Amino acid sequence: MDGGGGMLGAVVCLLLVFAIFPLLLWRRRSDAAHRLPPQPLQDERVLRGGPAPGPAARRMRRRPLSTSADASTSRDRDVDDADSDLEEEIQDVPRGSKKKEKKRQDREAQRQAEEAARDSRRTKQDRYAEMRRKKDEEREAQERLMEEEARARKAKEEEAAALEFEKWKGAFSVDAEGTTESDTQDDGQGLLHNFVEYIKNQKCVPLEDLAAEFRMRTQDCINRIITLEGMDRLSGVMDDRGKFIYISTEEMKAVADYIRKQGRVSISHLASNSNQFIDLEPKPQYNEESNLDENAAAGTEL
């Protein structure tokens, strides 16, 4: 019986060894994974070949194994919960960092957009200022050109008027009583004065009579009147009947004042009331002076 009991104990021990060994291996792997210190082996004496425990000892041995398994499961659960919390915290940290990074990027994009808008406005203002500067320069250059052209035109007109005046002085002639060409040129200024004064005194003079008075052709007389008007020596109008009506500067001013006061005035109304502003009565001073000059000339001849 003792030999049979020993064999039975040995078989039971082997079974326990084979049953406990996987548990021990699993616990070591779990502890290694969670960095936990290894648990002491409670049944070390069984592995060392000690006496076989009895049924009560085996029951007591099973209870710690179950308790140890429960504790290991609880620890694993706690470790898993801790890992889960750690992962959530790790996930929360990047999420907050991403929000901050996104806000920073948004602020940077807004700053760049504002800077680009300012640059665009500055560029437009510079372009507008440059365009205005060029336009001002072009306008000033055009004004200078117009002034130069006006001065050149005025100088040309004055030169032409002076040349025409010199020609006109030589065109006057006197009756052939021994007067030479040099005498005519010397008396040109006096003849010009007489021509102008004759028209002013006659007020309304037929062009043919004027030409006959100064021994000129009618067309030459018309040209001379136009020249004198350009020189501001005479002012007036030529009608379609071949008459020149002299109108002084004061009379023209009176007509302009009348038109300004009346507003719109028809030509017929102005013509009917022209005698209020323009004196058309001839003045005899020139005739008397002419007679005196003729008498003096006749006395000289005698």
UniProtKB/Swiss-Prot annotation:
It comes from the Eukaryota. One of its GO terms (molecular function) is ubiquitin-like protein ligase binding. It is found in: Endoplasmic reticulum membrane. It is a single-pass membrane protein. It holds the Pfam family DDRGK. Residues 79-91 have a biased composition (Acidic residues). Keywords: Endoplasmic reticulum, Membrane, Transmembrane, Transmembrane helix, Ubl conjugation pathway. Belongs to the DDRGK1 family. Substrate adapter for ufmylation, the covalent attachment of the ubiquitin-like modifier UFM1 to substrate proteins. This is DDRGK domain-containing protein 1. It comes from Oryza sativa subsp. japonica (Rice). The lineage of its organism: Eukaryota, Viridiplantae, Streptophyta, Embryophyta, Tracheophyta.
